[in-house]
């Protein structure tokens, strides 16, 4: 893990990360210097032990069928001064590579008055690929290999940069920032 100091100690923060597996949000939350909030689809809260764990780590249930609920929830949390983790790909990757961001994040980035921190995640896909019902223990349990997990918090910046950008410009900028942070995560992953 690197770049932890890039997460502001106070005030609203939008952390924008790539989404490799179910491990991403809790691991980013554990690595963060602040207690994060993040959205998780409501169906994940049906398994009681898992629900307790992710709720304890800051998960907020949302119904993915109601598109605007998630945006409203994130804006409310930011207005209350919370740091919120978002995965704008919308779902876990099927291939381990970063997917195009959904357009909703552009509206959120434009409306939010906060600090934005790009977050790169590498190796979580190997630990728990989308196609598997259960995690693969080797990336976490075995000695250091290029298959370990790396998390990098990129340089923070103000959401004000998005005020004059159109949707496509915002999406491009966010994707570039998260891709840069992911490069940092891969470097950390290879060092561990």
Predicted regions mapped to residue ranges:
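Catalytic core of membrane glycerolipid acyltransferases/transacylases, capturing the structured
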Residues: 9-66, 72
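Residue-level preference for the first positions of well-ordered beta-strands
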Residues: 12-14, 81-87, 117
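Hydrophobic/aromatic ligand-binding patch that stacks against planar heteroaromatic rings
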Residues: 28, 53, 76, 107-111
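A cross-family acyltransferase "interaction/gating" segment
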Residues: 50, 97-165
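Short, hinge-like loop/turn segments at secondary-structure boundaries
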Residues: 55-58, 80, 134-137
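Catalytic-site beta-strand/loop segments enriched in glycine and acidic/polar residues
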Residues: 77-106
């Amino acid at each position: 893990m690197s770049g932890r100091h890039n997460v502001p100690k106070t005030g609203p923060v939008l952390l924008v990360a790539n989404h490799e597996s179910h491990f991403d949000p809790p691991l980013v939350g554990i690595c963060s210097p602040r207690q994060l909030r993040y959205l998780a689809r409501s169906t994940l809260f049906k398994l009681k032990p898992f629900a307790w764990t992710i709720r304890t780590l800051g998960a907020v249930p949302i119904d993915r069928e109601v598109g605007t609920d998630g945006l409203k929830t994130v804006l409310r949390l930011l207005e209350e001064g919370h740091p919120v983790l978002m995965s704008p790909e919308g779902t876990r990757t099927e291939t381990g590579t970063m997917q195009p961001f959904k357009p909703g994040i552009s509206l959120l980035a434009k409306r939010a008055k906060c600090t934005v921190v790009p977050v790169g995640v590498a190796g979580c896909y190997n630990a728990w690929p989308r196609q598997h019902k259960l995690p693969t223990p080797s990336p976490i349990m075995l000695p250091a290999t290029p298959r370990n997990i790396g998390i990098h918090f990129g340089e923070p910046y103000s959401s004000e940069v998005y005020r004059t950008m159109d949707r496509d410009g915002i999406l491009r900028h966010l994707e570039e920032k998260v891709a840069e942070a992911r490069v940092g995560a891969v470097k950390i992953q290879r060092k561990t």
